[in-house]
């Protein structure tokens, strides 16, 4: 008597319904990571364009396009790493690695999404499109081997945040402030080093099995680098609040932008607490969304900054002259 073989779970996963394919593609695009792209709105805030409807629409378009740029990187990396990911318990459940989403379908999605994203980016601003291309090239360089180069790996992680800030300024056609560049880069290095610190604390002697470059980072080295970057981040932001020439004239005179410094200090200290005491820090965007005190602090900083910039800017219509 013959029995009919039942398809295995993995075989079933390889034949998703047509309705589930868009959801699987979306999952592979990592929408949780899109929160990083909020940094594209920094130029809108600090260039005093947050009441300009045209600038707001351009910033929203830039946000959406950068989400697509980063998502295409995730799709391509998951296609390339599908065999390796299928053997790793941490990544085996990803749609492509598990077989739930055929890699050919994912490749087709990239073939459609990426050209459209570049065309729309070019129409928004050619320089914005160039930054998008540089961002993708940076991510591919990281994925294809540069992530194994000590120190450079951290700079590449951090550069993604700097490129986002630059792209946001280009999208709304405002000058790129030297303070935006310096503070963003130092803050991004702070997050990147804490990511490495978290991995070393969490994995201990097995850290190199997770990421080979971790063999090159001793706890003492990470501590020294973090000390330098943390102090530099606080100092650079503090200097910005009372020396930046792109602040509205009244704020340059009354120095009230310094009221935002405590929020930055608390945010940095809270993040260090979460890394050292709670073993978090592997994903900055998830930490921000999950930790209520840090989220509240970020919102208060943004609201306070926007309020001060608006009240003391010409767009408020308030005359602060003698």
Task: Give the positions of each predicted feature.
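Short, amphipathic, aromatic/basic-enriched membrane-interface segments that mark the entry/exit
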Residues: 25-32, 94-106, 123-126, 146-154, ...
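Central hydrophobic cores of alpha-helical transmembrane segments in multi-pass inner-membrane proteins
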Residues: 66-75, 114, 135-140, 269-270
């Amino acid at each position: 008597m013959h029995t009919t073989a039942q398809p295995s779970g993995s075989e079933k996963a390889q034949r998703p319904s047509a309705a589930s394919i868009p959801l699987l593609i979306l999952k592979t695009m990592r929408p949780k990571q899109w929160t990083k792209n909020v940094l594209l709105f920094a130029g809108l805030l600090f260039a005093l364009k947050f009441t300009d409807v045209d600038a707001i629409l351009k910033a929203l378009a830039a946000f959406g396009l950068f989400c697509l740029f980063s998502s295409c990187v995730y799709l391509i990396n998951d296609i390339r790493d599908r065999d390796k990911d299928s053997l790793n318990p941490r990544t085996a459940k990803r749609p492509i690695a598990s077989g739930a989403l055929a890699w050919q379908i994912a490749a087709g999605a990239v073939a459609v999404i990426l050209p459209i994203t570049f065309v729309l980016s070019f129409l928004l601003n050619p320089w914005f499109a160039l930054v998008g291309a540089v961002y993708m090239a940076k991510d591919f360089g990281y994925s294809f081997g540069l992530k194994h180069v000590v120190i450079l790996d951290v700079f590449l992680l951090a550069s993604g945040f700097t490129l986002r800030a630059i792209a946001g300024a280009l999208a709304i056609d405002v000058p790129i402030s030297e303070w935006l560049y310096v503070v963003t880069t130092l803050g991004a290095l702070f997050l990147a080093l804490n990511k490495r610190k978290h991995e070393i604390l969490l994995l201990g002697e097995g850290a190199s099995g997770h990421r080979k470059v971790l063999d090159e980072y001793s706890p003492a080295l990470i501590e020294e680098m973090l000390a330098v970057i943390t102090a530099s981040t606080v100092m650079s932001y503090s200097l910005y609040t009372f020396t930046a020439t792109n602040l509205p004239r009244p704020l340059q005179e009354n120095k009230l932008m310094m009221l935002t410094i405590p929020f930055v200090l608390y945010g940095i200290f809270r993040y260090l607490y979460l890394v050292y005491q709670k073993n978090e820090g592997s994903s900055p965007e998830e930490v921000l969304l999950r930790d209520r005190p840090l989220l509240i602090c970020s919102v208060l900083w943004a609201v306070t900054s926007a309020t001060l910039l608006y009240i003391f800017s010409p767009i408020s219509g308030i005359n602060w002259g003698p």
